[in-house]
């Protein structure tokens, strides 16, 4: 990837979501962005204004003279823009008709409709950002919680880029020493270089392992944590869902089997995005519809990252309760011992023979008792080892994680090769492979096809 600014045609797109709103933004980027906007703008001559200024005027159809909208136009000149090209943003009134009319006028004056993610792609191709920072733009847009937003901002600020760049530089330095050894064997520095190669491989591998240790948390922040609320009928599953959502999504009655399907909702719990699944009560039934719901509930347990197993402490432990405890034994789970506001009938001693006391949170959902403790346990369960995600460098997407694992595998081969006494020029091949894989993360050695595919996932106007 070249950091020099490359000339492209001028592109245009609507950067705000479609529909009614106070303001819409139509964005242009490219060598003729200012001249194109000038053709449809009635106000100041945009070709004469200073960079990073905003101007009042009207958009007018240059052929018919029809007044389209009253607007504010921002002019930002290269290279101090997101794309490192001239950028113009037309702030018009929100609404589908006026916004589309303005876009069509710009296209009629020679601008091209931008492809999905093309503004961000140009920022990457012009050296403004690397691939990790480009991916963080979409992560920021899609962030479901404050913590997810912090991680995205952290990457956008270049923290992951800086770390990967440092690791590549460390590998490059030792590869240069290996080249000297190969080119000038008479200096007989093989032993010293081999020792340096081993130490560097171990150092870089430790840093990569530390990054990979954040992968599960990063994936949760990016995609959400699939959380199944399970239990036999009428123990308070739907009440728990409604309380966590702060609204009534599930039917709550005293009738067993009221929830006959699987309900899914997203909720933010202390910065952890939960994809809550309220399942039908798991029990033996002859009702055909209920049977389908029970089967879907069993599937939800299998697919869930976290189980909230709700038990009713106002009733004795049942065979169905024990079956659910056994079915979820190998999953991350929290035992929600509900209905603490009612007289106790459940034998706690018997329960503790089946579950750890650390798994139990006592609740009385109608009074909110224990709900703060439940939220805290969920957050601690998944982010207990990461105190401050604002400063912690994390990886969150499958592409980055996969490349880090491939780099780690190459470093394993380096270390194994050195211990096996392999020639240094053969070991060098695996060290170079690790360097290449790290470069793919930032885009420095990424193939064009990958770059095109990555940016195609972005939304229009970004």
Curated annotation (Swiss-Prot):
Subcellular location: Cytoplasm
Signal sequence interval, chain numbering: none
TrmE-type G domain boundaries: 224-383
Free-text comment on the cofactor: Binds 1 potassium ion per subunit.
Gene3D superfamilies assigned: P-loop containing nucleotide triphosphate hydrolases (3.40.50.300), Probable tRNA modification gtpase trme, domain 1 (3.30.1360.120), tRNA modification GTPase MnmE domain 2 (1.20.120.430)
Record's GO cellular component terms: cytosol
Binding residue positions for Mg(2+): 238, 259
The protein's role, per its UniProt record: Exhibits a very high intrinsic GTPase hydrolysis rate. Involved in the addition of a carboxymethylaminomethyl (cmnm) group at the wobble position (U34) of certain tRNAs, forming tRNA-cmnm(5)s(2)U34.
Family affiliation: Belongs to the TRAFAC class TrmE-Era-EngA-EngB-Septin-like GTPase superfamily. TrmE GTPase family.
Assembly and interaction partners: Homodimer. Heterotetramer of two MnmE and two MnmG subunits.
Name under which the protein is recorded: tRNA modification GTPase MnmE
Species this chain originates from: Lacticaseibacillus paracasei (strain ATCC 334 / BCRC 17002 / CCUG 31169 / CIP 107868 / KCTC 3260 / NRRL B-441) (Lactobacillus paracasei)
């Amino acid at each position: 990837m070249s950091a020099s600014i490359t000339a492209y045609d001028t592109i245009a797109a609507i950067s705000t979501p479609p529909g009614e709103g106070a303001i819409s933004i139509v964005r242009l980027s490219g060598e003729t962005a200012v001249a194109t906007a000038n053709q449809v703008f009635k106000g100041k001559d945009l070709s004469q204004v200073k960079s990073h200024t905003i101007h009042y005027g009207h958009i007018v159809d240059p052929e018919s003279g029809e007044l389209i909208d009253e607007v504010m136009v921002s002019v930002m000149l290269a290279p101090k823009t997101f794309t490192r090209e001239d950028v113009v943003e037309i702030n018009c009134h929100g609404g589908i008709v006026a916004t589309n009319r303005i876009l069509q006028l710009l296209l009629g004056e020679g601008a091209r409709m931008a492809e999905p993610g093309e503004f961000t792609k140009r920022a990457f191709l012009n050296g403004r950002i690397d691939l990790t920072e480009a991916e963080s733009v979409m992560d920021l847009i899609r962030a479901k919680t404050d913590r997810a937003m912090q991680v995205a901002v952290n990457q956008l600020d270049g923290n992951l880029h800086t770390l990967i760049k440092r690791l590549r530089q460390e590998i490059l330095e030792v590869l240069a020493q290996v080249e000297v050894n190969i080119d000038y064997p008479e200096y007989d520095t093989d032993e010293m270089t081999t020792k340096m190669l081993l130490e560097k491989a171990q150092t870089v591998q430790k840093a990569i392992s530390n990054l990979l240790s954040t992968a599960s948390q990063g994936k949760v922040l990016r995609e959400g944590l699939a959380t199944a609320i399970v239990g036999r009928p009428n123990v308070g599953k739907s009440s728990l869902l409604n309380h966590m959502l702060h609204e009534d999504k599930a039917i709550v009655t005293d009738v067993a089997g009221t929830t006959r399907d699987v309900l899914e909702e997203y909720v933010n719990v202390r910065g952890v995005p939960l994809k809550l699944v309220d399942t039908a009560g798991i029990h033996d039934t002859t009702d055909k519809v209920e049977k389908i719901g029970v089967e879907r509930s069993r599937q939800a347990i299998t697919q869930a990252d976290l189980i909230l197993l709700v038990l009713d402490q106002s009733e004795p432990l049942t065979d169905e309760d024990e079956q659910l405890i056994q079915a979820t034994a190998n999953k991350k789970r929290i035992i929600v011992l509900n209905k603490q506001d009612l007289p106790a009938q459940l034998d706690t001693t018997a329960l503790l023979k089946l579950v750890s006391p650390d798994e139990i949170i006592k609740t009385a959902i109608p009074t909110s008792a224990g709900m703060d403790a439940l939220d805290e346990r969920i957050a601690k369960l998944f982010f207990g080892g990461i105190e401050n995600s604002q400063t912690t460098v994390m990886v969150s997407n499958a592409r980055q994680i996969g490349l880090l694992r491939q780099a780690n595998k190459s470093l394993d081969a380096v270390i194994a090769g050195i211990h096996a006494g392999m020639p240094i020029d053969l070991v060098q091949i695996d060290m170079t492979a690790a360097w290449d894989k790290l470069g793919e993360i930032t885009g420095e050695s990424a193939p064009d096809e990958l770059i095109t595919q990555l940016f195609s996932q972005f939304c229009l106007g970004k």
